[in-house]
Amino acid sequence: MANSASLLYDQLKVAEPFFLLAGPNVIESEEHVLRMAKSIKDISTKLGLPLVFKSSFDKANRTSSKSFRGPGMAEGLKILEKVKVAFDLPIVTDVHESSQCEAVGKVADIIQIPAFLCRQTDLLVAAAQSGKIINIKKGQFCGHSVMRNSAEKVRLAGNPNVMVCERGTMFGYNDLIVDPRNLEWMREADCPVVADITHSLQQPAGKKLDGGGVASGGLRELIPCIARTAVAVGVDGIFMEVHDDPLNAPVDGPTQWPLRHLEELLEELIAIASVTKGKQQFQIDLTPYRD
């Protein structure tokens, strides 16, 4: 199990031009997830991009207690296992409690640590002990240096297979911005750097609802902008949530990318990545210039 994780990790580290973590935000039904997995795999295979399929079994930090959360861990893992077998795809999904890591590690190839929990040592250690690849999302409240420490917690628990993910920084109330400097600085964690190009455009609890209450909004129209920036900088991986009907998605509809435009966007990103030197350190010569 640990060997298969290391093999996948080694493949993702050298993926060119980048690897892709993609899928619908949450498991809505078995039929929907299987259909989405097939569609996304068909596109990624056509474009030659290594794909890890993503979907969550439980959205534990919804804005409202009345919001849809997903099928739960037991049922959700059964569905993700079917995706894995049916389409020969590695799986990434998130955990929220240390007690979930063992069961999730039996299905997922990558265990994702949510941004709000990126400093939780017990959770990081429990996830690391699964032997699977660990993808740590940078908290919206954190500087880039926190990711170096979080990655080190995973390594000290005996697991060298770790990645860090930029997903935006709080900018006042109910808004996030993406600081592209973090995509460079997070390399100090000495591991692959992933850019979450969808959640990073979320507007947390920024949408007022008719009849009172709030929900999270988002700036879907800026997803291409953030994606172009990320691949130009030279990230190792792109994380994005994709939906075939985003206006009716039960979770994070405003920041899910339409499936019908996925191939078009990825083609553009591949073209940008093919000409950038972002993965190479720019060597600056500060000696006095002479003609």
Curated annotation (Swiss-Prot):
Its EC number is 2.5.1.55. It is found in: Cytoplasm. GO terms for cellular component: cytoplasm. Gene3D superfamilies: Aldolase class I. It catalyses: D-arabinose 5-phosphate + phosphoenolpyruvate + H2O = 3-deoxy-alpha-D-manno-2-octulosonate-8-phosphate + phosphate. It is an enzyme of class 2 (transferase). HAMAP family: KDO8P_synth. NCBIfam families: KDO8P_synth, PRK05198.1. Belongs to the KdsA family. Catalyzes the stereospecific condensation of D-arabinose 5-phosphate and phosphoenolpyruvate to form 3-deoxy-D-manno-octulosonate 8-phosphate (KDO-8-phosphate) and inorganic phosphate. Involved in the biosynthesis of 3-deoxy-D-manno-octulosonate (KDO) which is an indispensable component of rhamnogalacturonan II (RG-II), a structurally complex pectic polysaccharide of the primary cell wall. RG-II is essential for the cell wall integrity of rapidly growing tissues and pollen tube growth and elongation. This is 2-dehydro-3-deoxyphosphooctonate aldolase 2. It comes from Arabidopsis thaliana (Mouse-ear cress).
